Amino acid sequence: MTKKIIAKKIIALVGRPNVGKSTLFNRLSMRKKAIVHDLPGVTRDRKYTDGRIGSFEFSLIDTPGFEENPDSFGKRLMEQTTKAINEADLICFMVDSRSGILPDDKLLSDFVRKYNKPAVLVINKCEKAFDFDKEYYKLGFDSMVAISAEHGTGMIDLYDEIIAKLPEEDSAEAEIHDPIKGDCLQIVVSGRPNAGKSTFINALINDERLLTGPEAGITRESIEIDWQYKGNHIKLIDTAGLRKKATITESLEKLSASDAINSIKFANTVILMIDALSPLKQQDLNIASHVANEGRSIVIVVNKWDLIKESEKEAFKEEFYYQINTTLPQVKGVPALFISAKNKQNIADVLDSCIKIYKTWNKKITTSKLNEWLNFTTEAHPLPLQKGGKRVRVKYMTQTKTRPPTFKLFSNNPEKITDSYTRYLVNNMREAFDMPGVPIRFNYIKTKNPYV
């Protein structure tokens, strides 16, 4: 079974008046097709357009705002919304972060969920950093995203949630469920100058597509190459070598470095290329930390392995793994491969590792399994008693997003949870759910509810 998006999908924007449906409609259609006004209820009919986020194209429906209204006009507006829901493959259920959850939001969410359609809760008007309040979970949606339709922020996260929720379609040629088929896996190759990034890509695609040579810094801007690997659409992105900021003086190199850093922001997976003759410098660790902080998945590749003496390879690996696991705890267990791009040794293993870690990066864990694990783990190693004999407890957790896996944990006193205890939970989760090498994010929320 393979997740493939073959026919153009239909997405309906549903919500009460003035939550920003028409603004998002205009944003996704790339042109102004819907009238937008602060006055509620401007939209009265279903409107259709071709929408797009990145390379993903779909049909989009704007619907009238729902209000509990028994008169015939209100019923006719609701009929428009009902028809849109019936037509849609996916519902974007929109709410307004400024006003919070209102009774009409709850009524409409109950109505929408009766149709058992894939749905994403879209929390609009989030111009500033937004923390998902537990009130939003009461609407009953297991997928949610914060955006600003007016300013265009959160569109990448919206894309991720939509793709994850769209129905799967059978593919006769597929043997296993593979979440990247039908999508484009963007792989950025990053590292210090002269680590062999361009040589690696040339070897992978079996073409001298990129200029290479012994001189450091040949690549000055990010180069994208579309490629197919085992039936998967791959976009390989070669980037300029990244030196320490203090050593960068020329304006052109500053632009190249900025371009390379920007490419990492939009990557799915980053290959960190390291020169075996000059392994694990501070700049390598800086790049890896930046990738983890951006929430990207990472694969570490040690190139020029053919230049290391056979008698020294075992000791090299032991020291290398020790340094990686002690200096990069945020991606503990990250895969490391040892290759020779020049001799095309082990280069296919790199792509297999990228696909595997991409699946881990996309992993979704059910709430029941999470809390079964949480109860066992916190009972095995509880937090110490506080003054007065009261114990800090982590009572409940849920996964709020993937890419990277992000979790919300409810506690009676979250400010007392130490960094070391969080590391204990994260490391335990990696082992329990087989999640090596990807950033795992925990967000703690204070709750006084004894049942949550």
Curated annotation (Swiss-Prot):
Annotated organism of origin: Rickettsia bellii (strain OSU 85-389)
GO terms classed as biological process: ribosome biogenesis
Keyword terms, alphabetized: GTP-binding, Nucleotide-binding, Repeat, Ribosome biogenesis
Residue span(s) of domain KH-like: 363-448
Binding site for GTP 2: 191-198, 238-242, 303-306
A GO term for molecular function: GTP binding
Cross-referenced PANTHER family: GTPASE DER
Stretches assigned to the EngA-type G domain: 9-170, 185-362
Protein name: GTPase Der
Residues annotated for GTP 1 binding in this entry: 15-22, 62-66, 124-127
Gene3D superfamilies: 3.30.300.20, P-loop containing nucleotide triphosphate hydrolases (3.40.50.300)
Record has Transmembrane as a keyword: no
Cited InterPro entries: G_ENGA, GTP-bd, GTPase_Der, KH_dom-like, KH_dom-like_a/b, P-loop_NTPase, Small_GTP-bd
Assembly: Associates with the 50S ribosomal subunit.
Protein purpose: GTPase that plays an essential role in the late steps of ribosome biogenesis.
Similarity-based family: Belongs to the TRAFAC class TrmE-Era-EngA-EngB-Septin-like GTPase superfamily. EngA (Der) GTPase family.
